C-alpha cells in the first residue's frame, strides 16, 4: 500500500484505532484494533482523466520545469493542495496525473499557499529512492520569504520545537530590504509541517500573508520554494 494513500486515509479519518479517529503519530497498544474504511481493488490501469480546461492544462504543462522517466519537477501554483484531504477533493497531484496519464508519488510537500519547486516521482522505486535522499539530507531545499520585520542578525540559525516536541531547525540569511520589507533565503535543516512559517512566527517575524499562524488575510503568502539540489 503506498504511503501516500495511508496518509490520505488518515487525513480523511478512514483509518481508525478502536473505531476512534487516529493520527499519523498515534501509538498502538496490545489489543488495539485497526479499522480501514477503504475498498482495495487491483486495477490493471488507472483512469486518471478528470475534466480540465485547455487553458489550465497549458498552464500546468508550462510549470513543468524538468521531466525525467522517473520523476518530474514542477513550479507549484500558489493556492493548490498537493494531495487530497478531508476538505480537498481534487489535488494538484490529480491534475498532473490526468495531463500526464501516469501515477505520481509524493516524495515531499509544500503547503497549499506556498509556491515553487516540487518533485513528483513516477514510480515506486523512484519514490523510495528520492524519499531516502531527503531523509539523509542528500537533497537540499531552499526558500524565499518576505517579512515586514527584520531579525537582529542578518543571518543565523533558528531552533525551536513544535507542539509535538519535535526539533525545528533552519538557516536564514537576509538578502534584500525594500519598502520596509525584508527578503530572506532559507535552508531547511529539518523537515516538519509548516516549519518555516511556524519558526518565523515563533521568533516574532511572521511571513507576509501567513494565515496559519497570524490573521494576515489581506496578502498572498510570500513564501516560495526556489531550489532543490
Describe the role of every protein-language-model region.
Residues 1-229:
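RNA pseudouridine synthases
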Amino acid at each position: 500500500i503506498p504511503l501516500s494513500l495511508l496518509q490520505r486515509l488518515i487525513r480523511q479519518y478512514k483509518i481508525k484505532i478502536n473505531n476512534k479517529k487516529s493520527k499519523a503519530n498515534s501509538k498502538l497498544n496490545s489489543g488495539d484494533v485497526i479499522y480501514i474504511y477503504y475498498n482495495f481493488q487491483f486495477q490493471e490501469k488507472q483512469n486518471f482523466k478528470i475534466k480540465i480546461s485547455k487553458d489550465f492544462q497549458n498552464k500546468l504543462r508550462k510549470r513543468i520545469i524538468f521531466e525525467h522517466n522517473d520523476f518530474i519537477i514542477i513550479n507549484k501554483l500558489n493556492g493548490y493542495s498537493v494531495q487530497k484531504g478531508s476538505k480537498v477533493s481534487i489535488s494538484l497531484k490529480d491534475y498532473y496525473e490526468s495531463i500526464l496519464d501516469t501515477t505520481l508519488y509524493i516524495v515531499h510537500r509544500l503547503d497549499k499557499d506556498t509556491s515553487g519547486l516540487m518533485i513528483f516521482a513516477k514510480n515506486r522505486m523512484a519514490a523510495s529512492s528520492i524519499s531516502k535522499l531527503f531523509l539523509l539530507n542528500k537533497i537540499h531545499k531552499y526558500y524565499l520569504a518576505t517579512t515586514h520585520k527584520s531579525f537582529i542578525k542578518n543571518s543565523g540559525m533558528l531552533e525551536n520545537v513544535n507542539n509535538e516536541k519535535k526539533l525545528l531547525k533552519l538557516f536564514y540569511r537576509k538578502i534584500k530590504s525594500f519598502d520596509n520589507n525584508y527578503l530572506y533565503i532559507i535552508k531547511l535543516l529539518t523537515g516538519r509541517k509548516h516549519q518555516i512559517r511556524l519558526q518565523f512566527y515563533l521568533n516574532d517575524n511572521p511571513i507576509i500573508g501567513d494565515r496559519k499562524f497570524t490573521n494576515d488575510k489581506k496578502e498572498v503568502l510570500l513564501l516560495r520554494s526556489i531550489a532543490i539540489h
